């Protein structure tokens, strides 16, 4: 069962990269989360994904999102993410990195940030310094390097 899910995941990652990799410009990362990122994809799994933008917003990003969505529809064995959920969308790095806690940190943003950290995979060429790696560094910097600048704010409660 585990080996079957691993093989199914590896196969699907390859098919997605072949189907959409060339359509994703270098300022975007096509990122998958959940069972596909954990290499546990089954016939019941959906494909949770986002297009991660780190930089200037561009009207063309929406077109890329629609092409990715269409390409994923064409890959046998894939199900769309929950339409009311946090996936299948454009995600902007500024919100993920800087809206931590408080009223601006909505459930979808928190979900994306946590899953980026613990279970995400780049679906396009990871050799290029894509937004995913920069955003991961940015999140970790916010969590761990910002604290020394605020000595009254203790990282670990006493």
Model region roles, listed by residue range:
Residues 1-26, 86-88:
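N-terminal regions immediately upstream of nucleotidyltransferase
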């Amino acid at each position: 069962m585990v080996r079957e899910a691993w093989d199914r995941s590896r196969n699907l990652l390859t098919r997605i990269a072949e189907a959409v990799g060339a359509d994703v410009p270098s300022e975007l990362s096509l990122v998958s989360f959940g069972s596909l990122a954990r290499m546990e994809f089954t016939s019941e799994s959906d494909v949770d994904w986002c297009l991660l933008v780190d930089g200037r917003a561009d009207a063309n990003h929406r077109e890329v999102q629609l092409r990715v969505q269409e390409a994923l529809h064409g890959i046998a064995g894939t199900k769309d993410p929950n339409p009311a959920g946090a996936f299948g969308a454009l995600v902007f790095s500024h919100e993920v990195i800087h809206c931590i806690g408080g009223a601006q940190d909505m459930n979808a943003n928190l979900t994306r940030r946590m899953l980026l950290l613990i279970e995400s995979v780049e679906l396009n060429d990871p050799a290029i310094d894509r937004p995913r790696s920069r955003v991961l560094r940015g999140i970790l910097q916010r969590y761990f390097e910002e604290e020394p600048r605020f000595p009254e704010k203790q990282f670990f409660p006493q």
